[in-house]
Amino acid sequence: KQTAETLLSLSPAETANLKEGINFFRNKTTGKEYILYKEKNHLKACKNLCKHQGGLFIKDIEDLDGRSVKCTKHNWKLDVSTMKYINPPGSFCQDELVVEMDGNDGLFLIELNPPNPWDSDPRTPEELAFGEVQITYLTHACMDLKLGDKRMVFDPWLIGPAFARGWWLLHEPPSDWLERLCKADLIYISHMHSDHLSYPTLKQLSQRRPDIPIYVGDTERPVFWNLDQSGVQLTNINVVPFGVWQQVDKNLRFMILMDGVHPEMDTCIIVEYKGHKILNTVDCTRPNGGRLPEKAALMMSDFAGGASGFPMTFSGGKFTEEWKAQFIKAERRKLLNYKAQLVKDLQPRIYCPFAGYFVESHPSDKYIKETNIKNDPIQLNNLIKKNCDVVTWTPRPGATLDLGRMLKDPTDSQGIIEPPEGTKIYKDSWDFGPYLSTLHSAVGDEIFLHSSWIKEYFTWAGFKSYNLVVRMIETDEDFNPFPGGYDYLVDFLDLSFPKERPSREHPYEEIRSRVDVVRYVVKHGLLWDDLYIGFQTRLQRDPDIYHHLFWNHFQIKLPLTPP
């Protein structure tokens, strides 16, 4: 089983005193040495240990840029800004450690152990027959994999919204999607976000196959934490440890890996059939702490960006329309370059961008739809092709990739079978009604007749002893105060509910939320992702600081049972 090990911790004072460029540290308890490289707000870290023969690195006095260190044994040089050895050039890459902030402005250096768990029991790839392994794209992050005589499905979101009512499917799934799901031998669900764990989809599946085997990683917050409340009857959910091969049959196995070093929520997966690896990093920011298998047969990952309320839902101060547009453009470009570099580094035979095909299609979210520009998968694939020889696939719903054909000859016209001419690719209607009326049913609930629910809810939530005052305002569709709605302050320092802001110095945040969504979230004890990632809030803050502990608590750490 894979575990995360803390190698070094720095106090808030030591972290604040990190200088630009190279910093050397020693863990006084273990005697082990480490290097931290700081460039503006970005930190990189590695062991102070030369890969050649284990020598110690010291400052390289010939380096005027302050980026490289020199080994005391044979003068090998490492550029710590890229983690690549520059003398001799093209020799090694240094293994990066994960830098984690601890919430109090200190930091940890962490290593996953074992770092490359897929190397246990390695298998030599065997030749695949044509048609033996087929991958069919259904929609968003949902793939249907035929692997010999087994079928596996990733992240089925085929109907309904995600994040309350903020996200809707961009692509029209193939009409036989439910039959495909019912035929699956196993389903992998990467994490609890509703564009991957879709209860409306699973409800339809469970009516036909309640015992379908579903596999999830052993995350800190269980993926299916809300199953009982959802009313969906699924009886075969399997929670598996990270970094351990799960054998399906003699040819097929899979391994679930964590994101970064925090098994809080996100996971990714390696599926291996007859020695050929399919790597799906899903939404992971730093899958497996940045260590991934190279030369996989097929790699797929998210690419689009825009999966957050920031900055579209913010106003005041610097948040002008011009600033937002520039920020979004720059962030999307950074993400595009990062994904292209990752593909270049990992050198899969084939790469497929997916898990970004959503749209803010409800008319009330027109502003978000127009502002929240996503990356174009074709643009990413063109960037990849410019940098390396990886074959790329921009999937259309119902399109099928034949892995055996593509590995043998990427130019084979039968390698990717597109959906028939005239197949509907993009959705142009969504069944808003039933989903919105479910949310709206919470508005008139008797628990909201008296303001006593406010204290009860935030006491249940359990976040306190933090200097932050939040004003919560219930609103209509257009974020204007809801007639007869609640407008109140919460002081999280002592968890009080004052009539006006306290006189002490305090950070302040104002959160306007659509009344149907916020009351539904409160009543059912749901996570605030529905509000924030679902674009159901408008925010102002003073000063302009991201309160990680506050948001992390309400997005991941709320109690598992409703108030």
From Swiss-Prot:
Task of the protein: Sialic acids are components of carbohydrate chains of glycoconjugates and are involved in cell-cell recognition and cell-pathogen interactions. Catalyzes the conversion of CMP-N-acetylneuraminic acid (CMP-Neu5Ac) into its hydroxylated derivative CMP-N-glycolylneuraminic acid (CMP-Neu5Gc), a sialic acid abundantly expressed at the surface of many cells.
Q: In which pathway does it act?
A: Amino-sugar metabolism; N-acetylneuraminate metabolism
Q: Describe the location of the Rieske domain by residue ranges.
A: 10-108
Write the lineage as a comma-separated list: Eukaryota, Metazoa, Chordata, Craniata, Vertebrata
Which organism is this entry from?
A: Cricetulus griseus
Q: Which GO molecular function entries does the Swiss-Prot or TrEMBL record give?
A: 2 iron, 2 sulfur cluster binding; CMP-N-acetylneuraminate monooxygenase activity; metal ion binding
Q: What class of enzyme is it?
A: oxidoreductase
SUPFAM superfamilies to which the protein is assigned, alphabetical: ISP domain (SSF50022), Metallo-hydrolase/oxidoreductase (SSF56281)
The domain of life for this entry's organism is Eukaryota
Q: Which cofactor does it need?
A: [2Fe-2S] cluster
Write the protein's name. Answer: Cytidine monophosphate-N-acetylneuraminic acid hydroxylase
Query: Do the record's keywords include Ribonucleoprotein?
Result: no
